[in-house]
């Protein structure tokens, strides 16, 4: 078995509280990337486009409270701006899904979600397999799915797009996609995972019931196709 980290990885993760605190120090105090979080958080390539705290939060190596107070210290000594606001917002969003789980219990695992929607969903194994393997009609989806398979990581922007494609375009039972994420993600958290999948799939808390335009998203967030080329390079020949 090859345990080497893929050289393309945006997040060569190492577990434990010591590594979590090291990441906090680097992202906040040494590189001061927190000051630019709002502008970079939808990035796709590189280790510093987002905070990458989620795996350590998921396994308890660091707490939201610890990160929150470190942000407050940063705001006092370095800078308070929209970026510091947005990182706090994301911590609150994460806790919000925990409260959704507490309120609704096992409904988060039901096909109709917390809204108890009666939609028709498919469950084709071949469609699911092609999605997992990055073999769909959308290169942007494929690149993100290959990144997940190779590294256990996917950007927030990527997760929204592949989930929307799975549930809204392929009409597949969203829980199948959520379960695959559960099996693959370094930062799997039951509340965030199933909460976000419900949200994207139209059976959760989003009142707009949106469907992502995958090609528009790719053009906006990967306009030069750098991310797609990075992960699809081995599938072009």
Give short role names for the model-derived ranges:
Residues 1-35:
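Long hydrophobic alpha-helical segments that form multi-pass transmembrane helix bundles
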């Amino acid at each position: 078995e090859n345990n080497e980290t893929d050289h393309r990885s945006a997040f060569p993760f190492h577990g434990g509280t010591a590594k979590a605190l090291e990441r906090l120090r680097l992202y906040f105090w040494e590189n001061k990337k927190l000051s630019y979080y709002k502008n970079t958080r939808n990035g796709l390539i590189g280790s510093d486009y987002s905070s990458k705290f989620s795996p350590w939060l998921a396994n308890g190596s660091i707490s939201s409270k610890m990160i929150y107070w470190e942000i407050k210290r940063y705001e006092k000594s370095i800078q308070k701006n929209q970026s510091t606001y947005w990182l706090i917002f994301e911590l609150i969003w994460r806790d919000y899904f925990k409260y959704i789980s507490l309120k609704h219990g096992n409904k988060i695992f039901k096909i109709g979600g917390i809204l108890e929607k009666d939609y028709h969903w498919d469950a084709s194994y071949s469609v699911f397999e092609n999605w997992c393997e990055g073999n769909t009609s959308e290169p942007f989806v494929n690149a993100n799915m290959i990144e997940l398979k190779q590294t256990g990581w996917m950007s927030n922007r990527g997760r929204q797009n592949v989930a929307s494609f799975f549930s809204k375009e392929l009409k597949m039972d969203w829980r199948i996609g959520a379960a695959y994420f559960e099996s693959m993600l370094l930062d799997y958290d039951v509340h965030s995972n199933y909460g976000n999948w419900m949200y994207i799939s139209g059976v959760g808390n989003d009142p707009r019931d949106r469907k992502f335009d995958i090609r528009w998203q790719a053009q906006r967030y990967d306009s030069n196709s750098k991310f797609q080329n990075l992960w699809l390079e081995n599938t072009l020949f």
